[in-house]
Amino acid sequence: MEIRWLGHACFTITHNGYTLVIDPYHSDYVTGYPKLRGVKADKLLISHDSYGHNYREGVVLSGRPESDCPFSITPMEVWHDTVCGIMRGSCLVHLIEADGIRAAHLGDIGAPLTGEQAGKLYNLDAMMVTAGSCTALPSQEVFRLTEELFPRVIIPMHYRDGNRGPRRLEHVEELTKHYAPDMVKIYDTDRITITCDMEPQIAVLRFQGLPPEPPAAPGKKASTLSRISSKMPFFRRR
């Protein structure tokens, strides 16, 4: 299973030639990143409807039938805040499994898991989790969560990366400082291949740009309405 980080909380997850994309972002609201355009995938997953996570227009789906999907995908509803959703509602954690590999994308999780949810997410091969923010769990709570769930590979996401990402997010070092230094592995690439026997680690991937945009169909232009609506700030939560 290959996991590629496209910035913020967006990843592609590929297995046996089939690709999921999760949480595509609108660059008007996740500043510093280039605009997502024409990211190719076979299936789209979204943790919650905010512009930092739901930019469907940036994804081109293949149209392959569900029967082609090699993944078992289990969504779990969690709170996006510490007050039972009063401030930010809920979001989805996605448990993604294929050929014995278990990975999870925790979205903007903002509160502890239930016992049942924790049981389903225990001892994952890979966990994509926020590095800490005021709109999700802070870094100290993320560390406690990973200590409880014991994932083999922790992939930080949703953090301030240089001049990329919302300023209110924490930097990745605010999370990695809680772990032994020899556990933290800084990658020179934006992707990692997950296996059942890889060494435990905090895998900090490096943003390396976005996939090239596919060429537009000859003579086809976006309508004025679609161009305007893509910029309208209906929902600003990240």
PLM regions and their residue ranges:
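Active-site-proximal beta-strand elements of phosphoester/diester hydrolases
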Residues: 2-5, 19-23, 72-78, 93-95, ...
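Binuclear metal-ion centers of metallo-dependent hydrolases, dominated by the metallo-beta-lactamase
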Residues: 4-6, 87-88, 153-238
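Pre-active-site segment of Zn-dependent metallo-hydrolases
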Residues: 10-46, 50-64, 74-89, 109-120
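A short helix->loop->beta-strand "cap" motif at the edges of active sites that frequently abuts
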Residues: 18, 149-153
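Conserved acidic residues
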Residues: 42, 125, 152
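Metallo-beta-lactamase
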Residues: 52-100, 180-199
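Active-site-proximal loop/helix segments of hydrolase catalytic cores
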Residues: 83-149
